[in-house]
Amino acid sequence: MSVAATKSEISHNPGKMSVTSAVSGEKVEGDVQSRMKLFGAIQAFRDGRMPDNEQIGSVLEYAIGHSPVDLQKLSPEGRVLIEDFRDTLETLRMIVHEKNSDELFQNAVWSSYHGDVSKAKQDGVIPVSNEQAKQDGKTAASHIRVLITLFLTNSEARKLLKDFGIVGRDIFATAATKAADKSRPSQEKLDSVDQEAPSHEWIGADGKRLGPNETPDIQIKGPGGTQARYHPRDDPRDAQLVDDKGKTRSAGEAYNQAQEAKSDAQSKAQDLKSSARDYKETGKQQARSHAQDVAGNRDPNASLSEQKEQVKGAAYDKRDAANAQADQNLPDPNDEGNQEKARGKAAALRDRIPEEHRQKAADYIQKSKNFVNDELPEERRDQFIYRLKKVVVECQGHKDYQEAMTWLLDTLENYRGHAKHVANKGTESAQTVANDPAVGDSTIQFRTLLERFANGKSLDNVFSALDQIYTDVQNDSELREWFTTFNDYMHRVLLEPGYILDEDSDREARQLRESGRRFFQDKYKAHQELLFDELQVWLTAFGEDPLNVRLGDDIKRFCKDLLFNHEGNLTFKPKLWNDVRQVLLPMLLKQVSYVPIPRAEYSDNSIDLVIEDLILSGPNLFPNLVHIESFNSFSFSPYPKLNKTMDNQHHKFRLSLSQIQADIRDVAFAFRRKSGWPKLSDHGLADVVLAGKGISVDVELESIENRRDTVFKTNFIHVNIDTLKFSIRNSKHDLLYKFIKSTATGLIKRAITAAVQNAMHTALGHLDEQLVEVRNRVDEAKQSDETTRTQALKDLYSRKKESAQEKKAAADEKTGTFKIITDRDSQLNPELTHDGGKSWAKRAFKVEDAARTGKEWRSPAFNLIDPAHPAVTGQHHPAVQNADVESEKLKQRAEAAAPGVAAGTKRM
């Protein structure tokens, strides 16, 4: 029999069966379904799948027609904002329908992943073995990581980044004074911008300061105490990852665990199809004999195929013509006639752009330059440049820099020589890859998609201009010589310590810049302008596309109604933000009020325990009443002699938490005792209700002065439980549970009370120990050297963290294993359950199967409003069932064909 129904009530004295939010079966089921649908969509994306247009359209239409908030509760401004958002969604739906009507984007992405680039292999051509190339790649990656680490951990580089941020905030605040005064940095920070950091210093993990003969570790900290840490010379897979619980594992282990979950889930389907592959291969052998006949009769009317063949044919014609007349018809970049033609074409393209637009762009660019020059004067720019050079010089003095940079430059020169050796072979190899249907389809599809978004404007002119620049570089010996000189200069800058600060370095850089202008601003300027003009024409068409214009207008209107008034000035809208506070936020809290836990398992040497279909309600678990009292007393004297003999301050703090409740229904449990007496197993359903005032906790702390071994004492911890109801049903021992229920209720209350008190005593004791050590360390550092207090705290917390990890590891060895199950392969005891047919965990596994089912890139998991979704029905999706049936048919055909194949082989 279930526990009596609870009712929702929020008051100072709620009824005995009242909770903050009574559990609603329909709402719980709705929350579970929505979260499982989201889980399925995420799993499908992880599996490399994408939603089709129908699935995208159905979700957008549903979002447009179903507002998550009651519009009548919103202000007029709030309703306008909702309509703006709906207009944006409708425009996105139209873009998907018109620009991607044949699902070109999904097919292009799929094709790009399934192109066979192995056809580019040229055996016997490359004078470096595969093993040597792999080893060089690993060594290069290690050296690059070392160089990046040296620059990122250098004190001067870190201060430069900080100073750039301060200057950027100041510029932003100046450009938008009314809107961003709060973002402006203080004058003290601005004054420190031009100051240099300590020389020859690198910052390692936990802020440790290192010298030029030490290699710093990289440490990246995340929220909740998570962090990643690794040595730059190590393989990235050996990087140490620490989660929010303090558990440490390598990046390789984390990646392998994720891959194992994916591969194991697919293994069953692969086993079913393995026997069918042999049967399919025999059919392929027969089909290949007819392949050439079929290829000659291919339908040329399919739009994408026809376009692909036209593009390929044009490319082949252009290649043949170029090869036949290579020595006679190559355009001479020095010929004045060719340059005049290019300039004329560029001028014609520029004339297409309205003078008003060109003038507006020029004015905007000039204003931006003037503004930056005012905010960043030449003196500050020179100082920043000098400090950047200083970073390079300091890194050049580090022992790891010379080794890494020398190896990289030498290896680059080595492979550059190999590249010349295989240049001609590489052309053939690239053509082989381009002829692969998947690669060719992907290239054409992406290009077609871009042209559709530019209102049908072709990209042919852009690629022609780009090809012309490539031809210029290939045919100009002077330009190649300039690049050689530039390469020599970069070698000296990167390898010779201090050369970057020498006047010869600046002089040679100016000479290279001046000589380069002859190529980039004079000789090939017309070709560059042609490319830029073609790009500008195409981007103009992109910006004038009706749907792109409509989407931009929708977003502008949404931002205007959200942030600006009718005059276009940034303004605060109190009614709109009241809607956010009073309507939107409560709605969001309701959406996350239930936290479903499909399956949790615990196992040790004495018991296996499984909890399924557990729902935690946030509003119930959070205390409804929080009461804080604080008593503070201070005493002092104007005479130092008296101050030394008196307690200067005393504090007392009291915290009361009340109405911590729970309304947990229909939780499935199963357990199996493996030792002790009696050895039994059972499964069933349980209800647990903490109602009324629920759990109340009252704690009082008092400070203790003039003692180095403690900071505060705990005067008392009172815990009280008001209403506790529980019920167990559908088990094998219902009679036993009913018999002991009345006695067990009191025992459970006392056990919960004692557990909460002991846990709080232990937690407060640990807090007192930590505060004592922090206070004592800071006092010692303050007496010795003012500048070491921060470092003392860092060292202290580093040791505390290591100690906590050791204690946790020791605790894990003594206790059992607890897991919240997220996939079927992580279950400790998969056979231990109450009712597998109704389990949320089993339903989640079927959602995962649906996410990995579908032809090519498709998946039924994206059908979020499909009534046949496994999250709704609890059954396999029809697509999964059909796939299983098809696999079984293929298996039967393979088995039936096996005797015939064997007999034919024997006769041969």
Swiss-Prot record:
Biased-composition ranges for Basic and acidic residues? 179-192, 231-247, 261-283, 306-321, 338-359
Superkingdom in the source lineage: Eukaryota
The phenotype of cells or organisms lacking this gene is: Increases mating efficiency; progeny exhibit increased growth as hyphae. Leads to defective capsule attachment and higher amounts of exopolysaccharide shedding and biofilm production. Does not affect virulence in a G.mellonella model of infection.
Which Gene3D superfamilies does the record associate with it? Bactericidal permeability-increasing protein, domain 1
Pfam families attached to this UniProt entry: HAM1_C, HAM1_N
Locate the coiled-coil region(s) and give their ranges: 255-282
Matches recorded under InterPro entries: HAM1-like_C (IPR027842), HAM1-like_N (IPR045967)
What triggers or suppresses the expression of this protein?
Repressed during mating.
Q: How is it modified after translation?
A: Palmitoylated.
Q: Which UniProt keywords apply?
A: Coiled coil, Lipoprotein, Palmitate
* Segments for region (Disordered): 1-24, 177-359
Functional note: May act as a negative regulator of mating during vegetative growth.
Q: What is this protein called?
A: Putative cell signaling protein HAM1
Source organism: Cryptococcus neoformans var. grubii serotype A (strain H99 / ATCC 208821 / CBS 10515 / FGSC 9487) (Filobasidiella neoformans var. grubii)
**Which gene underlies this protein?**
HAM1
